[in-house]
Design a protein with these regions (language model features):
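Conserved nucleotide-cofactor-binding alpha/beta core module
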Residues: 125-126
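Active-site pocket-lining/capping segments in soluble small-molecule metabolic enzymes
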Residues: 2-122, 140-144, 149-231
Length: 236
């Protein structure tokens, strides 16, 4: 574990990237214009990604790129093109959900650090150890875990464990919800969740019955660090 857990901030575009870096983030995560779980964001151009990475590295900030949607065989050639661009840019890690894509990355770029996306729903030590065997370097733990479960996973794996400390909570289990797909044909696992859970569904007279309160653990950072958490993730 590092002396201090990193603060990992989202960068949906250039303005957000600069704000995160100038406000003290240790690392940022960002997506290209395709194959990431925030399709609605501005995102980044693969042609200018090397300059973006260089700007961050010059300020001591790590850059992780999200390629964390499920990908079909038809889309694989374009995904490989994006992967090549990401690797050439010198990023510090790539987040994936699809295990098949993880295998391709490990074969094609064996030294490129692999990060397991929250969409993998890693919720126990067995799952974390499986990823470790596959060569993953960092894992985003499921939001639904207790502090005891987080501590057990952190203690039982050599991977760096990443935990969300601020952002939304899913009414389902993170990465497993189909509500947006069913109601609006917008898949959360393809980066297009419409968050229909935020609508005013009623149950027994209670409004917004599916809309959870947002997550905030900003008053628990020291406690999380003591559990072995290596990265505090802010949702983007």
């Amino acid at each position: 574990m590092e002396k201090h857990a990193e603060i990992l901030a989202p960068a949906g575009g250039e303005a957000q990237l600069r704000a995160a870096v100038l406000c003290g983030a240790d690392a940022v995560y960002l997506g290209l214009r395709g194959f990431n779980a925030r399709a609605g964001a501005e995102n980044f151009d693969e042609n200018t990604l090397p300059q973006t990475v260089g700007w961050c590295h010059a300020r001591g900030v790590r850059v992780y790129v999200t390629l964390n949607t499920l990908v079909t065989d038809r889309e694989l050639p374009q995904w490989l093109h994006s992967l090549d661009a990401v690797a050439a840019a010198g990023v510090d890690g790539v987040l994936v959900q699809d295990l098949g894509l993880a295998k391709i990355i490990r074969q094609r770029y064996p030294t490129l650090p692999l990060h397991a996306s929250t969409q993998m729903t890693i919720h126990n030590l067995a799952g974390a150890r499986l990823l470790e065997e596959m060569g993953f370097a960092q894992v985003v733990l499921a939001r639904e875990l207790s502090k005891e479960e987080i501590a057990a996973i952190c203690a039982g794996t050599s991977m760096r464990c990443e935990v969300f400390v601020h952002g939304a909570l899913c009414m389902s289990v993170s990465g497993q919800c189909y509500l947006s797909s069913v109601l609006g044909e917008r898949s959360g696992n393809r980066g297009r969740c419409a968050q229909p859970c935020r609508l005013d569904f009623k149950s027994h007279g209670r409004g917004y019955a599916l809309s959870l309160k947002d997550l905030t653990l900003t008053d628990r950072l020291r406690e999380l660090e003591a559990l072995g958490v290596a990265s505090f993730k802010i949702e983007g």
